[in-house]
C-alpha cells in the first residue's frame, strides 16, 4: 500500500471548505395538538347539558364526557357520581382507574 500523500494546511482548509460533507438531516416538523381548553368549573348551563345529554348515551365514562362535553376529567368524575346517585346511569364496571356506566333502563 503506497503511503498517503501529505496535504499542506492550505490544501486541507480548501478541501474542508469545498463542502464535501452532507448537511445534517432536518427533522420534519410535526403538527402539534393544541392544548385543550376544557371547562373546570361547573356552571348551571353545563350542569343542565349533562343532565339532558348523558342519559341518552349508551356508553358513559369519564373520557366520553371529556370529549363530548368539553369538561375537565375531575368534573366529569363528579358528574358521573352524581348521575349514579340519582339513578340516571348504572355502573357496568368500576375500579380505581376507570368507571364505565350505561344509561339506566326504565323499569
Curated annotation (Swiss-Prot):
Disulfide bonding pattern of the chain? none
Question: Could you tell me the superkingdom of the organism this chain comes from?
Answer: Eukaryota
In Pfam terms, one family for this protein is Ribosomal_S25
**Region Disordered: what ranges?**
1-35
Query: Could you tell me the keywords of this UniProt record?
Result: Ribonucleoprotein, Ribosomal protein
SUPFAM superfamilies named in the record: Winged helix' DNA-binding domain
Low complexity: bias regions: 8-20
Q: Which GO terms describe its cellular component?
A: ribonucleoprotein complex; ribosome
* Compositionally biased intervals (Basic residues): 21-35
Which family does the record assign? Belongs to the eukaryotic ribosomal protein eS25 family.
From the Swiss-Prot or TrEMBL record, give the protein name.
Answer: Small ribosomal subunit protein eS25
Q: Source species, please?
A: Candida glabrata (strain ATCC 2001 / BCRC 20586 / JCM 3761 / NBRC 0622 / NRRL Y-65 / CBS 138)
Its lineage opens with: Eukaryota, Fungi, Dikarya, Ascomycota, Saccharomycotina
Whichever gene encodes this chain, its name is RPS25
Amino acid at each position: 500500500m503506497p503511503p498517503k500523500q501529505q496535504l499542506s494546511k492550505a490544501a486541507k482548509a480548501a478541501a474542508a471548505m469545498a463542502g464535501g460533507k452532507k448537511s445534517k438531516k432536518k427533522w420534519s416538523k410535526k403538527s402539534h395538538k393544541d392544548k385543550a381548553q376544557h371547562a373546570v368549573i361547573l356552571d348551571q348551563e353545563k350542569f343542565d347539558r349533562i343532565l339532558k345529554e348523558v342519559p341518552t348515551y349508551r356508553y358513559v365514562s369519564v373520557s366520553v364526557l371529556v370529549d363530548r362535553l368539553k369538561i375537565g376529567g375531575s368534573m366529569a368524575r363528579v358528574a358521573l357520581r352524581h348521575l349514579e346517585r340519582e339513578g340516571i346511569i348504572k355502573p357496568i364496571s368500576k375500579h380505581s382507574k376507570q368507571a364505565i356506566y350505561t344509561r339506566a333502563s326504565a323499569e
